[in-house]
């Protein structure tokens, strides 16, 4: 039995090395297949113990060796397969702590960066320009607003286009569909009519009825949109209205 335990420990060591190699070679695939690996791991353990008892018979005097072998199997599972992203132990489920923390950290950093961009744009505006502009048509207003918002779009790596709301509603969002290749669902149209921002895929649509009724579209396909982007763009639109006579 002692020699068999040694063989078992040797096999455990080989499997452990294989798991480490698999993890470092393709971490994403490993995380995706982790639960299957666990099921296979314990399945092989149960089969090996069952086959051993069938061949050698049950000898309870060797319970210490069996317990040690079982502990090693569980140790490999907890120490490597589950750790550091423990998702389930004895029926108690936990979130993927490591990834969650990293995701929150990235969001906070991105939000802080967006805030700094917004502040810089506001600080660079010359107050002497306030109350000096006049827009005779909606088209003139949308072009002026678009030019003002372009500075924010360039900083975050996103395309921003301002559309006349009435024209888009009357043409089933033809302008937005042609430029951004998206279809605005009916429920989103209802939200826009209620002056609520929506997001279709990774394209944000912000309704603004400050000077004129417009839809501000942010294309975040190259750089994922943040919630802060919607707030910043709307606030910049308000700031732009100060230019009006």
Swiss-Prot record:
Residues that span the membrane, as ranges: 2-22, 43-63, 66-86
Pfam families: SpoIISA_toxin
GO cellular component, one term: plasma membrane
InterPro entries: SpoIISA_toxin (IPR025940)
Alphabetically ordered keywords of this record: Cell membrane, Membrane, Sporulation, Toxin-antitoxin system, Transmembrane, Transmembrane helix
Protein origin, superkingdom: Bacteria
Keyword Hydrolase on entry: no
Localisation per UniProt entry: Cell membrane
GO terms, biological process: sporulation resulting in formation of a cellular spore
Membrane topology: Multi-pass membrane protein
Main location: membrane
Similarity comment: Belongs to the SpoIISA toxin family.
Biological role stated in the UniProt entry: Toxic component of a type II toxin-antitoxin (TA) system. Upon expression in E.coli growth ceases. Upon coexpression with SpoIISB in E.coli normal growth is restored.
Subunit text: Probably forms a complex with SpoIISB in which SpoIISB neutralizes the toxic activity.
Official protein name in the record: Stage II sporulation protein SA
Organism: Bacillus cereus (strain ATCC 14579 / DSM 31 / CCUG 7414 / JCM 2152 / NBRC 15305 / NCIMB 9373 / NCTC 2599 / NRRL B-3711)
Protein's gene: spoIISA
């Amino acid at each position: 039995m002692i020699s068999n335990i040694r063989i078992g420990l040797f096999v455990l060591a080989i499997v452990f090395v294989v798991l480490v190699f698999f993890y470092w070679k393709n971490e994403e695939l490993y995380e995706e297949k982790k639960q299957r690996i666990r099921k296979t791991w314990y399945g092989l353990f149960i089969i090996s113990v069952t086959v051993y008892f069938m061949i050698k018979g049950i000898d309870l005097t060797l319970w210490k060796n069996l317990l040690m072998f079982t502990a090693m199997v569980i140790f490999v599972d907890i120490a490597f397969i589950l750790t550091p992203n423990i998702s389930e132990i004895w029926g108690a489920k936990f979130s993927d702590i490591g990834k969650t923390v990293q995701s929150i950290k990235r969001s906070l950093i991105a939000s802080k960066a967006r805030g700094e961009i917004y502040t810089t744009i506001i600080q660079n505006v010359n107050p002497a320009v306030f109350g000096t502009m006049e827009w005779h048509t909606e088209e003139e207003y949308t072009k002026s607003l678009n030019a003002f918002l372009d500075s924010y779009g360039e900083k975050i790596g996103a395309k921003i286009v301002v559309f006349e709301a009435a024209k888009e509603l009357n043409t089933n969002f033809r302008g937005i569909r042609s430029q951004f290749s998206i279809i605005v669902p009916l429920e989103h149209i209802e939200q826009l009519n209620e002056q609520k921002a929506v997001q279709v895929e990774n394209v944000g649509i912000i309704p603004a009825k400050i000077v004129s009724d417009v839809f501000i579209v942010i294309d975040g396909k190259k750089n994922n949109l943040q919630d802060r982007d919607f707030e910043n763009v709307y606030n910049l639109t308000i700031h732009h209205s100060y230019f009006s006579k």
